């Protein structure tokens, strides 16, 4: 989860988020090297008194600054496309959850169970218990088993919303009349917080998401108690 004065990403809790962090570091290193080179050239141009008079026709330089950017773009595009296809690939999910956005709460349905669904509202500040987080706690958490492939079906009943959990690398738009899907697999148990990430009205900031990832045995016990 985030903490005050945080400058980086949240700790990765899914394979997708780990890949996104690696891609971020890869791209940032390329940007850093380019920025350093440009800054070095600008510094040389500002500090030298020498003038090169033969740069009006420099075929070699033009060739280099045409090919080099293309190579750099390829080095960025290939890992990006790989991750993009990984995020869209859903193979044999063991559990399917349908998340519906409303103004201003989420409702969840476990489609593999006959009658397991509930609404998830934010807990008002006045009702918070010691240790709970303001604007992030909900009355009904989405309980899921860890280390299993889970398919999320996401849509909306009214306006545009966005179902986002940063530590899992998830952000999927909830669009009325359209069913979007995402894959989810957590590698560690715990509570994972997210929020609606699409401005959806006056209470947009009061639509938290709380995932409770538990071992499979605990999930089976919980689902049995809910039916």
UniProtKB/Swiss-Prot annotation:
Record: residues binding Mg(2+): 198
GO biological process, one term: ATP synthesis coupled electron transport
Binding site for Cu cation A2: 196, 198, 200, 204
Membrane topology (Mitochondrial intermembrane): 1-14, 88-227
UniProt catalytic activity: 4 Fe(II)-[cytochrome c] + O2 + 8 H(+)(in) = 4 Fe(III)-[cytochrome c] + 2 H2O + 4 H(+)(out)
Keywords: Copper, Electron transport, Magnesium, Membrane, Metal-binding, Mitochondrion, Mitochondrion inner membrane, Respiratory chain, Translocase, Transmembrane, Transmembrane helix, Transport
Alphabetized InterPro entries for the sequence: CcO_II, CcO_II-like_C, CcO_II_C, Copper_CuA, Cupredoxin, Cyt_c_oxidase_su2, Cyt_c_oxidase_su2_TM_dom, Cyt_c_oxidase_su2_TM_sf
GO MF annotation terms: copper ion binding; cytochrome-c oxidase activity
Amino acids binding Cu cation A1: 161, 196, 200, 207
Subcellular location: Mitochondrion inner membrane
Principal subcellular localization: mitochondrion
Xref: Pfam families: COX2, COX2_TM
Topology versus the membrane: Multi-pass membrane protein
Family: Belongs to the cytochrome c oxidase subunit 2 family.
Role, per record: Component of the cytochrome c oxidase, the last enzyme in the mitochondrial electron transport chain which drives oxidative phosphorylation. The respiratory chain contains 3 multisubunit complexes succinate dehydrogenase (complex II, CII), ubiquinol-cytochrome c oxidoreductase (cytochrome b-c1 complex, complex III, CIII) and cytochrome c oxidase (complex IV, CIV), that cooperate to transfer electrons derived from NADH and succinate to molecular oxygen, creating an electrochemical gradient over the inner membrane that drives transmembrane transport and the ATP synthase.
PANTHER family: CYTOCHROME C OXIDASE SUBUNIT 2, CYTOCHROME C OXIDASE, SUBUNIT II
Subunit (UniProt): Component of the cytochrome c oxidase (complex IV, CIV), a multisubunit enzyme composed of 14 subunits. The complex is composed of a catalytic core of 3 subunits MT-CO1, MT-CO2 and MT-CO3, encoded in the mitochondrial DNA, and 11 supernumerary subunits COX4I, COX5A, COX5B, COX6A, COX6B, COX6C, COX7A, COX7B, COX7C, COX8 and NDUFA4, which are encoded in the nuclear genome.
Protein name, as recorded: Cytochrome c oxidase subunit 2
